[in-house]
């Protein structure tokens, strides 16, 4: 598969600056590519059988895996990562799958540089997902945390600031939840409990 990925990157005009096999099932690429159409780029790469992009960004890298925080840190040498901020979440899945796709953090596919970790439950997940899918968004899992990432990224794609997108989520998302968002230059946190019908 790696050979096919490399050939596809070359066909698309992407120049590989650095590549690293972090684990037998994981590759990390740093590429130079004209990112006018990230959706087309990601769809071409993911059309390769058995290949999935777990994150893609100019300034933000999402590292996802199964295991506790120390295991993931050791696997990916996170103690050597240089950056200004990070978010992470070790959790026990209760509603979603237990696989790398469903692990936190989530990015706003196909919009780079927006990442989310979340605790809680969205009660209007399927309604919001259908709305976003009808706008052309694609989901990699059935985890409601991913919906928050796509929701915020879609708002920012249309000109909202992180703060504005998060404020819009107060009326657009329903449930009891807390989430953190990281962008290339910002961090945001929101704690929300839906008003009681008696209020």
Could you say what each language-model-derived stretch is?
Residues 1-154, 191:
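N-terminus-centric sequence/structural signature that marks the extreme N-terminus
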